[in-house]
From Swiss-Prot:
Protein known as: Polyadenylate-binding protein 2
Domain RRM intervals: 92-168
A GO cellular component entry from the record: cytoplasm
Subcellular location: Nucleus speckle; Cytoplasm
Gene name of the record: PABN2
């Protein structure tokens, strides 16, 4: 049997690693092009993030400027001047409560015109335009306030008015309102209140002999 001969041209067949090395050696520009693409993409991402940060910072600055404008940022001297002016107006004004809903500013002005020169009458209303039942009367003279206080419990439209000196509201400061005098709560007893009618387990109207009387009664 004859042996078959196989001819190998060019020597031994190179392995896969050697072939890859040869391909890289033959195409050195492939890796450089891929690296350039990655660098370009990374640079674009950095530019995009930087643009987003700049837009966010600009939006924050715009929002801050808008808030400062709405809050009416003023210097302390201007705020103090406005507060002083408000206190001066309040010193010439009175609060009028229990005003009839059908009462007009002209009628309120006529009711207080004997006290002094009425500069302004303001009847407060709700969001629907309905009167709330109280008003503010501003006079030209400070002395008119004391005269107006004398009209407390005077009647207008058959209703007793409640006339008080107007308070000045200080911004950012909650004012303390003292409790009104109540003749039924002016004095508080230290002893707890006991009902005159108490349930007794010994029967109606009976109490154990070892108990002391609940209340002292000097007159029998």
């Amino acid at each position: 049997m004859e042996e078959e001969e196989h001819e190998v041209y060019g020597g031994e067949i190179p392995d896969v690693g050697e072939m890859d090395g040869d391909m890289e050696a033959l195409n050195p520009d492939l890796d450089m092009a891929a690296a350039d693409d990655d660098a370009v993409k990374e640079l674009d991402e950095m530019k995009k993030r930087l643009k987003e940060m700049e837009d966010e910072a600009a939006a924050l600055r715009e929002m801050q400027a808008k808030v400062e404008k709405e809050m009416g940022a003023q210097d302390p001297a201007s705020i103090a001047a406005n507060q002083a002016g408000k206190e001066e107006v309040d010193a010439r004004s009175v609060f009028v409560g229990n005003v009839d809903y059908a009462c007009t500013p002209e009628e309120v002005q006529q009711h207080f015109q004997t006290c002094g020169t009425v500069h302004r009458v303001t009847i407060l209303t709700d969001k629907f335009g309905q009167p709330k039942g109280f008003a503010y009367v501003e006079f030209v003279e400070v002395e008119a306030v004391q005269e107006a206080l004398q009209l407390n419990e005077s009647e207008l439209h058959g209703r007793q008015l409640k006339v008080l000196q107007k308070r000045t509201n200080v911004p950012g400061l909650k004012q303390f309102r003292g409790r009104r005098f109540n003749p039924y709560m002016g004095y508080r007893f230290r002893r707890p209140f006991m009902s005159p009618y108490m349930y007794s387990p010994y029967g109606y109207g009976k109490a154990p002999r070892f108990r002391r009387p609940m209340r002292y009664m000097p007159y029998q």
